[in-house]
């Protein structure tokens, strides 16, 4: 039994509070800046209390302000990011789940060779893969399409490895029982593996959704049409619009609105996310 010491508890809580402040302060600072005019933002020091233009800034940014700056509405930027993040998260989970299922539960020649070929891709930096991938997308005519934005990012060696490690912990008795019941591979996957994997899938979904939402380099390469930009690319274009007249109030509003979906995903799936991480490490 671990002895509870008041001093240790106090130090632990102080460290946690400090960590929360370090993480939360930039978000709060951005929110405060989103309630001020662009002139107030570029004249430090900025007040730590919200300004008088909160509603006005958000209303103007949503109803045409951002579109005047980058040529595409804020709603379209958010929608593009949502489509990309959902497609990448769901696509990675489906492909990785099926790949791990085949590697663990099917016996075919060179299956471990194929697994290690998938795993070795983790050692390749993005810069090595991005140019040949871009060439393929150009040749297939997928520039400025959702397919071009998402398909190259759907394969995931990490998710395949995690699913494989989890499937290896499935008792052999379950597999034998499924065979005795005359259950085929897909029925076994649907009725046994999917229910057992739901917490792992939830944890991976949160991680992969954030990964897809925050993509910058790939969308920057494969989108020329402003209407296909994601919210991250939109932010970059707003900052680069004109150094002397950058609408920093719109930039801060857009940054806050870009964070909200990620916070909602984490909060709504927090219980499943934590449970999935704990069960994965067992």
Swiss-Prot record:
Any Pfam family: BPD_transp_1
Keywords linked to the UniProt accession: Cell inner membrane, Cell membrane, Membrane, Transmembrane, Transmembrane helix, Transport
Recorded GO CC terms: plasma membrane
Chain ranges passing through the membrane: 14-34, 86-106, 112-132, 146-168, 201-221, 248-268
Annotated S-S bridges: none
Ranges of residues in domain ABC transmembrane type-1: 78-269
Subcellular location: Cell inner membrane
Main subcellular localisation: membrane
GO biological process: transmembrane transport
Domain of life from the UniProt record: Bacteria
UniProt xrefs under InterPro entries: MetI-like (IPR000515), MetI-like_sf (IPR035906)
Topology versus the membrane: Multi-pass membrane protein
Function: Part of the ABC transporter complex UgpBAEC involved in sn-glycerol-3-phosphate (G3P) import. Probably responsible for the translocation of the substrate across the membrane.
Subunit and partners: The complex is composed of two ATP-binding proteins (UgpC), two transmembrane proteins (UgpA and UgpE) and a solute-binding protein (UgpB).
Family as reported in the entry's similarity comment: Belongs to the binding-protein-dependent transport system permease family.
NCBIfam families named among the record's database cross-references: PRK10973.1 (NF008210)
UniProt protein name: sn-glycerol-3-phosphate transport system permease protein UgpE
Native species: Brucella abortus (strain 2308)
Higher taxonomy: Bacteria, Pseudomonadati, Pseudomonadota, Alphaproteobacteria, Hyphomicrobiales
Gene: ugpE
